[in-house]
């Protein structure tokens, strides 16, 4: 169990799930450092967290863009300088686009695959090395239920998340003995800016409730967490469906 207050870095902290997770961590007294692309949005988020924090801590910020890998090392260095050795690194940042858009725009498809898999993994590798160097810590990364099976509506997005989930499972097997705890978050549909305009399916969740479940998984050192909880049951059965059935389903 992580000793409170923890030194926490959140990448993607200005919107949606990242903001919800950062808020909950600040409210319980953790020292939080925010990473994101937009400095003005980071400043606003930091001010919001400061007002919610139960501890006497400043909320630091640094620019970190998953489309620009050259920003990764500097951002983590700034976070560690401000906080000291890191206990928890949370990665929520990602890109989403519909399958139709991705098929029509190969440039967009390339960016999404690069950001969601290759660049996220490179950021995680840098974070992983820092956590292990200080004796261990928690790397919590948002993947998706879309990566569980190949599906018609999310072929490319799902592939990016399938790769990320596989990477996180491999880290768990390779470095658990070294003190690295990996938490792979597999959200279903969550109402955030990323899903704005999309039809709301059954079992949809809200960001704050999902954040609560994620923090519980971090504290319990769970390697995989589905959120909302109903998705664990849904995906259990989806994984069992034979391929000829999956071909007929339009989801």
Q: Where on the chain are the PLM-derived regions?
A:
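Rossmann-fold cofactor-recognition segment
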Residues: 52-70
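Conserved mid-core segment of classical short-chain dehydrogenase/reductases
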Residues: 73, 94-110, 153
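Conserved glycine-rich cofactor-binding loop
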Residues: 14-15
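Residue(s) in the substrate-gating loop at a strand-loop-helix junction
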Residues: 144
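Active-site helix of classical SDR
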Residues: 124, 160
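C-terminal helical subdomain
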Residues: 184, 199-236
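Conserved glycine-rich Rossmann-like NAD(P)H-binding loop of the short-chain dehydrogenase/reductase
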Residues: 28-45
